[in-house]
Structure formats: structure tokens, C-alpha cells
Amino acid sequence: MHDVSPALYTAEIVHWIALVVMAVVYTLRIRWLLSFKLAADKSAPGNPAQSDKKRGARHSLFNVAMPWSMESTRSRKGFGFYLSFVIFHLGVVAGIALAFVSTIAPDVLRVPAVGWTTMTLIVGAFLVSLYRIARRTLRPLMRLISTPDDYFSLFMLTGWFALGAATQAYLMGIWGMTSETLLVAYLYLTSFFLLYVPFSKISHYLYYPFTRIYIGRALGHRGSYPFSRA
């Protein structure tokens, strides 16, 4: 255990309570999703030599980690957007890790290799989020399809990344960041996200495995996925 001030102790307790609430909501939602019976495809197998349900589902599920198999990444611009996607989500993972590790073993985040890796990922995600704000607000098509939740989530995540970078700097004792208030504020903001995310569009990742497996099974059964290039 590590010595903490009353303010930080309270923030840590709130943080873990928020995690429990999020876990309960997600458990109920996953249970609800699993209550639906998967519809059977009554059509005959399309091309068993090419693919089947299992292969299609497996390829569809892990497609996000295979940019070479995506139509959208064949151009330089498309691959650049994919890289920004990877950086953004790695930053989210680093930010979540920062919040939880700081409450359990903050000294780990002071190890130079760990600290600078965390800092790099969070700062990278912050820069990508600024690009996403510009893209969403300046492009007419993006404005047309954006909802208040999209803007709110993006602006809040951008602030979260900025505060996360400052918090990591505080833990490492760099950039003149010396106030524990940074860590307290970061834990409270993370707690807010843990409570908000299950009810926002950010929770799309919860549905990802279900939708990808379903579409992969359907197209794999018909022998059209994974597709083969001529």
C-alpha cells in the first residue's frame, strides 16, 4: 500500500466504486445480448473450400488488427487514418492503466521505461483527438452525421488525455508538475467516464465482438468471407 492524503483516498474509493457500477451495467447488458438466440442461416454452404462459419467469424473478429485486409487502408491516406485509430485507442488503454495503477502501485509509473511509454501513448492520443475535433467540426459531412454525444465524448476525452499527461508528469516529477490535485482530478474525471461510457456511444466496443462474429459467420457460411483477391 502507499500513503495517500484524505483527498486522494476519497478519489480512489470513488474511482473503484465507479468501476463496480460499470461492471454491473456491462454484465447486465451482455446477459441481455446473450439472451437472443443466434439465427441459423438456412442457405446451403456457399464454398466450404474457401471459407466456413468458424473461419469467417474468426477473421471478422480479428480484422481490426489486420489492416492489410481492409479496403480502407489500401491508400496512403487510409492507412494514415488507421494509424491514428491505433494511436488513439492505445492512448485510451494507457490512460485507463494510469488511473488504476496509480491507485495500486504508483511507483510502477515512475519507472522511466513505463512512465515514458505511458506518457508517449497518452500525448499521441491527445494529438489525434485534436485532429478528430478539427475533422468533425470542419468537414460538412462529419457535422451532418454527428450527435451531441459525439461532440461531448470527443471533447471530454481530449481533456482527459491532457489531464492524464499532466498526471503522468506529476508522478514522474517532470515539467514542474508538483500538485497532487492533478491525480485527484484525473481519478474523478476517469470515474465520471466509467459511469458515463455504458450509456453513451463510446460503449460500441461492447457490441464489437457480437456484431463481428455474427457477420463473419453469415458471410463465411456463404463462402464470401474472408475474400480472396484475384
Residue locations for each model-derived region?
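Cytosolic juxtamembrane amphipathic/interface segments immediately preceding
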Residues: 2-8, 67-81
